[in-house]
Amino acid sequence: MGNNVAETQIKPFTMNFGPQHPAAHGVLRLVLEMDGEVVQRADPHVGLLHRGTEKLIEYKTYIQALPYFDRLDYVSPMSQEHAFALATEKLLGITVPVRGQYIRVLFSEITRILNHLLNITTFGLDVGAITPSLWGFEEREKLMAFYERVSGARMHANYFRPGGVNLDMPAGLADDIWEYTERFPKFVADLNNLLTENRIFKQRTVDIGVVSRADALAWGFSGPMIRGSGVPWDLRKAQPYDRYDEFDFDIPVGSTGDCYARYLVRMEEMRQSNRLIRQALEKLAKTPGPVKVNDRKIAPPPRGEMKRSMESLIHHFKLYTEGYHVPAGETYTAVESPKGEFGVYLVSDGTNRPYRCKIRPTGFSHLQAMDFMSKGHMLADTVAIIGSMDIVFGEIDR
């Protein structure tokens, strides 16, 4: 009798999470192996937003290549422009005027707040808190207005340029940003009241996706992901660029390495960015002068000068048709973007186009740990883990 009973073999259930899923944060496709509702294995499939950015850049001049960086992590555009501009400046051997550097710091920190506002509020939405996302988008709108006033675009700014920034800030903008920084701490406090001690939010995030200090280093984490695990690593302090060493700010560090710790790190980073913005505005008020290098072979002449000088008109025409030639060489330049270390490995062969531009996206290193972080958690917890990673597929797929 016993011999006739077929042995039952229990196999894990395979399911697709995304790419059309509200919590996938873009076009993430996860192939999950489930034991009931517990994740045994998570296999992220990337490439659905691949546009060949690195190859396209090889066919563009250095000026034409810069706008591609806005379209990578499209919720924090100016940070990536910053990395490419610094890399090109390093190869050219030029130094940006002090006022231009302060404007870059100012808008890098506005970008950090823009990014964290979106991440924290949509992270709340992922785990069931709807109100923060409605508040967050309203607040981001005010910051996007600053983007628009300085560059003409709300998202794809194309404002940072090798040699400085495109134009100086328009009259009245500094006062409006200062006024915003006075109101912003109240908004952060309100957001803090909604989420930080919220019982349901803590149940969904505490002890979920725990990454130890050693594991965070081994997986190549950076930004809030590594700081949430207790490693005080921030390129603005460790390898200062564009006068960050003149600014006074703290690096928030978590202790538990879970989703909740990463949330707290981002909350405090918004407060620190507000401090940095105020310091940058104070320094700008005392620092008149040019915002880009006075080299007509690299930076285009002012419009008024082009109407008076034939030489300026020729420079402008040559810059926007042929571009400038960058001396042969290579450099790896990284900035502390809102998501972590965003790096550009730029190789020049002495022509007017990059020979190779390798982009080190921040989210790629974080997403590769998805299997490690979600193993043994419930299906609903993978949503919280993805939200705490702050991934955007524009930069991961490139």
Curated annotation (Swiss-Prot):
Q: Which cysteines are joined by disulfide bonds?
A: none
SUPFAM superfamilies, per database record: HydB/Nqo4-like
The EC designation for this entry is: 7.1.1.-
Naming one, the record's GO cellular component terms include:
plasma membrane
Instruction: Please give the Pfam families that the UniProt record associates with this protein.
Output: Complex1_49kDa
Q: Record's InterPro entries?
A: NADH_Q_OxRdtase_suD (IPR001135), NADH_UbQ_OxRdtase_49kDa_CS (IPR014029), NDH1_su_D/H (IPR022885), NiFe-Hase_large (IPR029014)
Q: Name the membrane topology term.
A: Peripheral membrane protein
Would you say which domain of life the source belongs to?
Answer: Bacteria
Chemical reaction(s) catalysed: a quinone + NADH + 5 H(+)(in) = a quinol + NAD(+) + 4 H(+)(out)
Where is this protein localized, as stated in its record? Cell inner membrane
Instruction: State whether keyword Plastid applies.
Output: no
| GO molecular function annotation | NAD binding; NADH:ubiquinone reductase (non-electrogenic) activity; quinone binding
- Chief place where the protein resides: membrane
Record keywords: Cell inner membrane, Cell membrane, Membrane, NAD, Quinone, Translocase, Transport, Ubiquinone
Name the protein family. Belongs to the complex I 49 kDa subunit family.
Spell out the NCBIfam families in the cross-references. Answer: NuoD (TIGR01962), PRK06075.1 (NF004739)
Q: Which PANTHER family does this one have?
A: NADH DEHYDROGENASE [UBIQUINONE] IRON-SULFUR PROTEIN 2, MITOCHONDRIAL, NADH-UBIQUINONE OXIDOREDUCTASE 49 KDA SUBUNIT
Question: What function does the entry list?
Answer: NDH-1 shuttles electrons from NADH, via FMN and iron-sulfur (Fe-S) centers, to quinones in the respiratory chain. The immediate electron acceptor for the enzyme in this species is believed to be ubiquinone. Couples the redox reaction to proton translocation (for every two electrons transferred, four hydrogen ions are translocated across the cytoplasmic membrane), and thus conserves the redox energy in a proton gradient.
Tell me, how does this one assemble?
NDH-1 is composed of 14 different subunits. Subunits NuoB, C, D, E, F, and G constitute the peripheral sector of the complex.
Instruction: Tell me what this protein is called.
Output: NADH-quinone oxidoreductase subunit D
